[in-house]
């Protein structure tokens, strides 16, 4: 399977909707798009991972590197996991939790709440 990344804007937030598999082969594409967002001067980024069916440790590495990049330029990164999965069941959430890095990310249930500066993230 491949990785697809669609870009949109909601308020001040750039939203990258990611679908498919996030792994060794496909992860560089997401990394490039995150870097392009920063190069364009945008500092608020939502990664919508609700369409990601598989994520390996390389994919998690790209998520961590994206967080580091956004923080280094005083930006913000928020993740969206599948509706129920944000709390328990999604593959991505399970991988993040198993690797002990879920707590590093602000996770929201949908784009609307992720792009709302008053909304609270889902607890880890």
Name each model-derived stretch:
Residues 1-53, 65-124:
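STAS-like cytosolic regulatory interaction modules
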């Amino acid at each position: 399977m491949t990785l697809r990344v669609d870009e949109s804007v909601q308020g001040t937030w750039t939203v990258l909707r990611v679908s498919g598999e996030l792994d060794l082969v496909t992860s560089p594409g997401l990394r490039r798009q995150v870097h392009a967002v920063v190069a364009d001067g945008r500092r608020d980024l939502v990664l919508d991972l609700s369409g990601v069916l598989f994520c390996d440790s390389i994919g998690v590495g790209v998520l961590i590197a994206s967080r580091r990049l956004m923080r280094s330029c005083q930006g913000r990164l928020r993740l969206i996991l599948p509706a129920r999965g944000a709390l328990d069941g999604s593959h991505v959430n399970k991988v993040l939790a198993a690797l002990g890095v879920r707590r590093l990310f602000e996770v929201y249930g949908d784009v609307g709440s992720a792009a709302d500066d008053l909304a609270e993230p889902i607890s880890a």
